[in-house]
Amino acid sequence: MGQPLLLIAAGGTGGHMFPAQALAEAMVRRGWRVKLSTDARGARYAGGFPHVVEIDQVSSGTFARGGALARALVPARIAAGVASAVVGFLRDRPAVVVGFGGYPSIPALSAAVALRLPRMIHEQNGVLGRVNRLFAPRVDAVCCGTWPTDLPEGVEGYYTGNPVRAAVLERAAAPYIAPGDYPMSLVVIGGSQGARILSDVVPEAIARLPREILANLRIAHQAREEDVARVTEAYDRAGLLAEVKTFFTDIPRRLSEAQLVISRSGASSVADISIIGRPAILVPFAAATADHQTANARGFVEAEAAILIPESALDPGSLSEHIAAVLSQPEAARQMARNALAHGRPDATERLVEVVEHLARKET
């Protein structure tokens, strides 16, 4: 019997592609053949996949971008992609098809439904994306990176967690040093593009902290390129020691050394914080589709691992009070860190592998 084939279908964003890559790496190590089905945009994110993974570029499209003519052509492009996927699957039959969301996953998942192949999806956020919501009732397993996840009626989800980078796993459950009268680290993460509202509010909020906290505080603040100068100046005016950059290459190390993290609540950020196990103040991106960042934060907040502040309620005074509450109560901060760890899923990739192998065994 030859090597079983796993067909991974994923859209062209890092959020879809990273967990897809983690699963691909794990399945290749287990002796599977792996193919990635994506569009031209997704192929640009596939550079980190194992070199043995075949990449099939499919015809697809989205109703979210382009003019009226481009949107009118989307159904025909998707239909062509589905037909091509069916032909490809008949020629080289996958043992399992896994969708990670995004319009480019439609052809492969549709072909899997038509041919009754074992199939599953993985959703990174606490609200299903459009494509995953469409296929959730039509697959054999719905794996959830965030818990709880808002699922269609009658659909059961399995909480696998979101796969994270090796650098994060290396620091999983790193010992937490509670706040005290010694140097403390505060990390501010604005997501992949930084966050203007955090740059507007956080420096002033920190400047309002009690003097005994400020004397020990060291800050690492990720900001948009156009905000770096003014954020740096704001910290300098307040006499605060701060590193302000558009991107920190060593975020896992900084998280492991932090007493408190202030962050957006993108799925990968919440996963990183929970696996390392740190208290957090989360400010969901208000314009996120279906308010999924609030959904991402919900379980973390309910576990008493984080404080949630909606953008509409974010101001220097209230944020300063929340920061002070965490940094002045060592035992409470320690408990938040423990709660964060309990919510994390450092074995997310292994859980996904188990579902794939279970579906493959059922088929045989």
From Swiss-Prot:
The species this protein was found in: Cereibacter sphaeroides (strain ATCC 17025 / ATH 2.4.3) (Rhodobacter sphaeroides)
Q: Does the keyword Cell membrane apply?
A: yes
EC number(s) from the headed UniProt entry: 2.4.1.227
EC class (word): transferase
Q: What is this protein called?
A: UDP-N-acetylglucosamine--N-acetylmuramyl-(pentapeptide) pyrophosphoryl-undecaprenol N-acetylglucosamine transferase
User: Where would one find the signal peptide in this protein?
Assistant: none
Q: How does it sit in the membrane?
A: Peripheral membrane protein
Please give the superkingdom of this protein's source: Bacteria
